[in-house]
């Protein structure tokens, strides 16, 4: 069941990739993908290329994939391990969602962080109280880690 669904998503992704994202299996393992997300141009992540790993559970799509940033990113909803705080990867997951939609949601999270449900409270606090400092820090991390 899972592998059939994952194959279908891979075909759909190759046919119609989401804007500024790409994804596919690592080697021969269909349950382990790597994705790239281009930093949105209207965000401090602009110009960066962010690597993301995707691990599908055996009962996908009834359980969400595990998605994490491999590239360091300064963001209130992404911690130093790359874990992403995004409702659709947790309690809001639905089997109707696809990796394409997940990648687009991560892109929009880069543009519009959710400081009210932070994974890193200090960054969320900076985002709310000193937006200029947040944006310049996010920009310098992007240049340092995502433009190699």
UniProtKB/Swiss-Prot annotation:
The keyword Transcription does not apply. Residues 1-147 form the UBC core domain. The active site is at residue 85. It catalyses: S-ubiquitinyl-[E1 ubiquitin-activating enzyme]-L-cysteine + [E2 ubiquitin-conjugating enzyme]-L-cysteine = [E1 ubiquitin-activating enzyme]-L-cysteine + S-ubiquitinyl-[E2 ubiquitin-conjugating enzyme]-L-cysteine. Keywords: ATP-binding, Nucleotide-binding, Transferase, Ubl conjugation pathway. Pathway: Protein modification; protein ubiquitination. Belongs to the ubiquitin-conjugating enzyme family. PROSITE patterns: UBC_1, UBC_2. Gene3D superfamilies: Ubiquitin Conjugating Enzyme (3.10.110.10). One of its GO terms (biological process) is protein ubiquitination. GO terms for molecular function: ATP binding; ubiquitin conjugating enzyme activity. Its EC number is 2.3.2.23. This is Ubiquitin-conjugating enzyme E2 28. Expressed in seeds, pistils, siliques, hypocotyls and leaves.
